[in-house]
Amino acid sequence: MEKVLFFGDPGIDDSFAIMFGLLHPEIEIVGIVTGYGNVEHIHAAHNAAYILQLANRQDIPVISGATKPLTEEITTYYPEIHGPEGLGPIHVPESVLSIPIYNFGSIASILVKYGKDLTIVDVGRSTSLAIAFNLWNDLMLNVKGIYFMGGVFLEVGNVTPLAEANVYGDPIASKIVFQQANNLFIYPLNVTNKAVLTPNMFDYIQANSKNPFHTIMKPMYDYYFSAYQKLNPSIEGPLLHDVVAISGLVNPSFFEFVNRTVNVDTYGDTKGQTFADFRPSSISEGACIALEIDEEKFIQDFIKTML
């Protein structure tokens, strides 16, 4: 059983990643750290709390993370992709607002409690993770591994021609994580752009699912797919970017990896660009970067888990 401290900014695809983690028999989520990103930090916290409420897992703490990037730039949110509060057309019920949100220092107790048995999955801006490295460096270096969704290598970005949204949102934080993390696994757009959930696949899940999220999945999916169609009318379905990283934790055989030292541009026209040396003579060291995915096996496992 993989014990996971989840960092994210839910967000529709973050929410599907949390659902996947709660339902997967090999994953135990022990805490969720929410911050700004797809939506404002307070909506992200309430969305995570709502998902936990639906799952009857209020024993899992929701921890308040970063409210703005280390770059101190004005944050751009994405209501056209994720909805005004982050769950598409869904508004969390009033009962969620009374669920306690824990302070950032609660991360330290989780790091101490689980130590080398803890894996961190980060699928949002890396601000909270970078702050955790600055506050509790020894404890952070002691975790089993860090699984990060973000970046892109040798392909185009999704928020600029060069940059992926999570890294672009706080490249200084991403740089801190890339430089300090031990046993870092990166799942960039190279693989997440292939994690397409078509309407037929989703309809099968919806028709056969008995999971506690059944009532909210369809409006979330429909909103998300509609947003993607406006950006790319030929797309076959929305992309499960964030699910890829947490799936990779328990399904490493679905991916092909290379090891490279990763860097990121932090300002200027190339802000948020991730890069590494992929020349034939380059040294195989540093982060483990997923560059290929068996999308059929990934989707089959996602469907099986969500039923």
Name what the model sees in each region.
Residues 14, 82-84, 128, 241:
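Histidine-centered active-site/metal-ligand motif
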Residues 5, 29, 56-60, 216:
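Generic alpha-helical hydrophobic packing signal
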Residues 1, 20-21, 26-29, 168, ...:
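Conformational coupling and interaction surfaces
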Residues 76-83, 160-164, 202-203, 279-281:
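Short, surface-exposed amphipathic charged segments that create phosphate/polyanion-binding patches used
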Residues 2-50, 91-194, 199:
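Active-site histidine-anchored catalytic micro-motif
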Residues 62, 177, 246:
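A residue-level signal for conserved active-site and pocket-lining positions in enzyme catalytic cores
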Residues 45-49, 53-113, 286-292, 307:
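Metal-dependent C-N hydrolase catalytic cores
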Residues 1-9, 62-68, 86-89, 128-134, ...:
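Short, mixed-charge, low-aromatic patches
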